[in-house]
């Protein structure tokens, strides 16, 4: 009896010492091993492409174009399963109202409203409405266009959230929204000149604000180094390395010209 108890005690002691030695090492059995094949896709999968949603959005975009052919000019689906609808400026209210109230749409949330300035276009400003449908868990992007002088209809009557968004666009880009209840600047100071997000707005601005010790207040003065337009033709740092320079183009010889002698 005593010998059997001694053997059990000795086995327990050996097991405890083995657990103590292996306490600092991770258990292989508890760690799942993930094996990847050679052809595994290593692209980010934050928002993977969904073929089912892609087909549904494409079908819905075609449906919107059939319902509102007067205003819808182009429909496409982005890589992140977001539908983009390009419309005529006159169709802002009809299209947004349709997308908000239609049973198969229900885009009742205006997530964002912004603008893009492309000076090379005839209608340089692109107005972008980002809508969200909580009912169907889908997004849609409505785009339209305008220029510096042509006003665009305000969307406040459809989405109340467009109020401050349109004020910000007016302040930063100078796009005028007709029938807006309170279209005034929202970010810049009183008496600010110009619209900072336009591509032709000078980087240094027109006015410099500083504190004057003589008059004991903040004064506004014209900027001495003001530039009228942004200059994108800058010197490249790679020009310091002759190896990376492109070889000079050879002169094209006209009929009757002689080839210049090599030096």
Curated annotation (Swiss-Prot):
Alphabetized InterPro entries for the sequence: NADH_DH_suC (IPR010218), NADH_quin_OxRdtase_su_C/D-like (IPR037232), NADH_UbQ_OxRdtase_30kDa_su (IPR001268), NADH_UbQ_OxRdtase_CS (IPR020396)
Topology relative to the membrane: Peripheral membrane protein
EC number assigned by the record: 7.1.1.2
Subcellular location: Mitochondrion inner membrane
Primary enzyme class: translocase
Domain of life of the native organism: Eukaryota
Xref: PROSITE patterns: COMPLEX1_30K
Listed GO CC annotations: mitochondrial inner membrane; mitochondrial membrane; respiratory chain complex I
NCBIfam families xrefs: NuoC_fam, PRK06074.1-5
Protein purpose: Core subunit of the mitochondrial membrane respiratory chain NADH dehydrogenase (Complex I) which catalyzes electron transfer from NADH through the respiratory chain, using ubiquinone as an electron acceptor. Essential for the catalytic activity and assembly of complex I.
Protein name per the record: NADH dehydrogenase [ubiquinone] iron-sulfur protein 3, mitochondrial
Native species: Gorilla gorilla gorilla (Western lowland gorilla)
């Amino acid at each position: 009896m005593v010998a059997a108890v001694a053997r059990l005690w000795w086995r327990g002691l050996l097991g405890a010492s083995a657990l103590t030695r292996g306490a600092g090492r991770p258990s292989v059995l508890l760690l799942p091993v993930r094996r990847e094949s050679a052809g595994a896709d290593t692209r980010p999968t934050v928002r993977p492409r969904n073929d089912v949603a892609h087909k549904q959005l494409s079908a819905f975009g075609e449906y919107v174009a059939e319902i509102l052919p007067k205003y819808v000019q182009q429909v496409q689906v982005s890589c992140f399963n977001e539908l983009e609808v390009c419309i005529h400026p006159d169709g802002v209210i009809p299209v947004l109202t349709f997308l908000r109230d239609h049973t198969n749409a229900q885009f009742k949330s205006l997530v964002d409203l912004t603008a893009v300035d492309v000076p090379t276009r005839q209608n340089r400003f692109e107005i972008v409405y980002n809508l969200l449908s909580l009912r169907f868990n889908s997004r849609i992007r409505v785009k339209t266009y305008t220029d510096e002088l042509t006003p665009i209809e305000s969307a406040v009557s459809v989405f109340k959230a467009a109020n401050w968004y349109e004020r910000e666009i007016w302040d930063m880009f100078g796009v005028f929204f007709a029938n807006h209840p309170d279209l005034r600047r929202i970010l810049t100071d009183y008496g600010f000149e110009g619209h900072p997000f336009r591509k032709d707005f000078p980087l240094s601005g027109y006015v410099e604000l500083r504190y004057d010790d003589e008059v004991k207040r903040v004064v506004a003065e014209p900027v001495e180094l003001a530039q009228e337009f942004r200059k994108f033709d800058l010197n490249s740092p790679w020009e310091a390395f002759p190896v990376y320079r492109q070889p000079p183009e050879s002169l094209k010889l006209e009929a009757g010209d002689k080839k210049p002698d090599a030096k």
